[in-house]
Amino acid sequence: MAEAVERTDEMVREYLLFRGFTHTLRQLDAEIKADKEKGFRVDKIVDQLQQLMQVYDLAALRDYWNYLERRLFSRLEDVYRPTINKLKTSLFRFYLVYTIQTNRSDKAQEFFAKQASELQNQAEWKDWFVLPFLPSPDTNPTFATYFSRQWADTFIVSLHNFLSVLFQCMPVPVILNFDAECQRTNQVQEENEVLRQKLFALQAEIHRLKKEEQQPEEEEALVQHKLPPYVSNMDRLGDSELAMVCSQRNASLSQSPRVGFLSSLLPQSKKSPSRLSPAQGPPQTQSSAKKESFGSQTTKGREPAGAPKDGKSLFGGLAPGESSWSQHRQRRLQDHGKERKELLSMTLQCAEKKPEAGGPEAEPCPEPHVEALETLTRVPTAGPEGGGVRPEQPFIVLGQEEYGEHHSSIMHCRVDCSGRRVASLDVDGVIKVWSFNPIMQTKASSISKSPLLSLEWATKRDRLLLLGSGVGTVRLYDTEAKKNLCEININDDMPRILSLACSPSGASFVCSAAASSLTAHVDVLAPDIGSRGTNQVPGRLLLWDTKTMKQQLQFSLDPEPIAINCTAFNHNGNLLVTGAADGVIRLFDMQQHECAMSWKAHCGEVYSVEFSYDENTVYSIGEDGKFIQWNIHKSGLKVSEYGLPADATGPFVLSGYSGYKQVQVPRGRLFAFDSEGNYMLTCSATGGVIYKLGGDDKVLESCVSLGGHRAPVVTVDWSTAMDCGTCLTASMDGKIKLTTLLAHKV
């Protein structure tokens, strides 16, 4: 509700300004500034009560509570009156305990002097009048509970929850219902998008099934063209059976050697015996094994080649006494028909692999075979080397699009919370905000006069962008109005804003400011740009209020102030993890605003850090090229460690003609997870690479190589707001690839 009230205030203010009602606007601003209800923000109301207690202003505290009773609590039913009275009693007791704890017994005596007439007839206050005169009230059995930290925290939480529920249940005017309508509209749009993606997937499946129905006829025609006429009507005949058939042939064919089906098939497909040795086992075992491997390639209920009709024509000349043997033969033909097609499928697969081996007898597979095989699998090439397809591949690539409106290397590329818009920033200070559904379209564009180093979407108001510069400022940019709302100066001594992270609650954001880089004082053409130690400069980590745009506090960075390269919140904003230039990961408790733990994580700088899906661990990538998982319940406990290629961790190098070389140190996110945290997207020299996490191996298993880039990818993002995940990969040539993936549900 607080968010809806805030948006409504802004809309009313904008309307009054549009109409020219400046006097009314000034009056509105004055009343909003003096608003005792704090825009229905529960945290602000509770803070106001605590502030009045801290200055011992009993009269103001009592007046403020009476105001809340008159404006808010009076709307409740009588059944909630006892709860309100208990909260009021606890509030006054909280005030009394605070006066005793701060050695202000005079304020406690003043409280009873002013409240005696009201409290002396209440049984719950009978024992409290002696409180100011006790030497050690915190040890008294009657009052010990109220002096504990647990009781104070419980009271604050109870008051907070009571006000939250009250605001949610309050009847609101019609103008405030717009927020609910917007949410319903967004939900309907999301459902429509999900249904559209499902329809797209079903259409692809129908197309695949139609291709599968056409494939057997193509395979049959191909085999009959290659094999002798009598073999095309038989499946794996034994020598004794073949002898009977030979007696029915013409004179020219009767001179042929008596061989089985496999011995006739092998020379035609140029298969080695070792490749087909499993096919010589029992028919039932072979058939069941192939069903598991190629279950998606065969269609049940189809009539196999070599049907009983063919068997009749072949054995039509047999004596009547042999009719039972003919029926047995027809059944065997039916049993072997399906196995033959499965064997042919394996033949196609092996024929595709043989040219890769580079053998002297390898032949390119005919075009109809390749097309049929690709239609059957319907999965993209797996692995960074572009190896063969695998039926267990976890994702299906539905499509890949390119956003090419940047003309220099990308630094940041982030999807907003709704998964509908993307904000991208390049090294020239060009910001682009664009959508990709249903079509790719630029929504806003801006060029910064000062260099920009960091970018972050605001969580609650996803139309706003936070932009950190290289001159010590943070800018709040409205992507819909296409203008800067405000610009704040962080620190002149720490001009580089390296990282921004907005709390999931939307009430605050953290800002990492650092002194000028060491590379600013050396030749920019030196070959060691981006090497170790270039960012070993002092830094600060600051907490700012999103609404007021004022600094709330500065975090302590032990053992000494250092530049913080990356920051990330957990899902509720209670924890903040940071990676610094000294290789240390620090975990901050955002409720106590202090560092809960820290440990040396990497040799060199920490480039990127994120919470895991269950938030029991954090992952980090460092300058040492390692991807490490850490347990946050035990400081410095390493869960797993993997080595990554140099093109996944940076610094990133783009080489050109005449010895030209462009080097870029990592700025944006280097890895991102899918919706369940089982797979990870990373950078590479030619595109994004998806790895499977949680395996027992000591190396990461590469699942999908997205490809599509001609320059090194420097930052990635993975949006899972829809059923179909969207992977973003941005490279040093300014190209951004948007790949749509469909998870392969098992």
UniProtKB/Swiss-Prot annotation:
Coiled-coil spans in chain: 183-215
One Gene Ontology MF term: phosphatidylinositol 3-kinase regulator activity
GO BP annotations, alphabetical order: early endosome to late endosome transport; negative regulation of phosphatidylinositol 3-kinase/protein kinase B signal transduction; regulation of protein catabolic process
Membrane-topology annotation of the record: Peripheral membrane protein
WD repeat spans: 405-444, 447-487, 514-554, 559-598, 601-640, 663-701, 708-746
UniProt keyword Repeat present: yes
Biased composition (Low complexity): 265-278
Location of this chain's protein in the cell: Early endosome membrane; Late endosome membrane
Gene3D superfamilies: YVTN repeat-like/Quinoprotein amine dehydrogenase (2.130.10.10)
Family statement: Belongs to the WD repeat WDR91 family.
Subunit structure: Interacts with WDR81; involved in early to late endosome cargo transport. Interacts with BECN1; negatively regulates the PI3 kinase/PI3K activity associated with endosomal membranes.
Protein name in the entry: WD repeat-containing protein 91
Organism of origin: Bos taurus
